[in-house]
Amino acid sequence: MTKSSRPQSISDSVSVAGSQGTLDDLRARVASVPEAPTREPVDSRDEQAWSYCLRLLTSRARTRAELTERLARRGYPDDVSERIMDRLATAGLVNDADFATQWVQSRHTYSGKGKRALAAELRTKGVSAENAAAALAQIDGEAERSRAAELVTKKLRSENLDDGGIKAARRLVAMLARRGYGQSMAYDVVKNALASEKDRRDVG
């Protein structure tokens, strides 16, 4: 298959936490897919499951496991779910590797999540260990540290440091831990940021 003829993937058309424009792109992508198969007939259960998945995908991108779970809740048997998932994948509407990549980029950039938290979120969504590892590899140690420092620096501006910053440091380390940053990195980032903030206030 040539590059120009390949199915459009999720990453081509939608960001997991992107703008309204990218959501509109996903909806347009879903709308362009026929409601009924074009090559061979299927039973009504397949058609119903297919339509249901398309409706779910108009709100946001989803993993294969998420859609399979939603179909199971509706009482669809495994063989129906498997056929629908394969068809969605062929249409470029379900791609767990693309989903994981977009999820990590978005949650790290906009929500400040560390790699541990991101790994847990991907597991919850049914992303395989292989796809999760590939997506998380986008964030190297320096990038993760830099994002943690941004979060801490922003919070420190409004902190009371009358006690030398002891209470503030505890709160900030706890905040980073909740966002999925390792303890060692959290302590180091907070220590450096606190020293810089004290210097800034002394000069001011």
Curated annotation (Swiss-Prot):
This is Regulatory protein RecX. It holds the Pfam family RecX_HTH2. Belongs to the RecX family. Keywords: Cytoplasm. Its main location: cytoplasm. Residues 1-22 have a biased composition (Polar residues). GO terms for cellular component: cytoplasm. Transmembrane segments: none annotated. Modulates RecA activity. It is found in: Cytoplasm. Residues 1-44 are annotated as: Disordered. One of its GO terms (biological process) is regulation of DNA repair. It comes from Mycobacteroides abscessus (strain ATCC 19977 / DSM 44196 / CCUG 20993 / CIP 104536 / JCM 13569 / NCTC 13031 / TMC 1543 / L948). The lineage of its organism: Bacteria, Bacillati, Actinomycetota, Actinomycetes, Mycobacteriales.
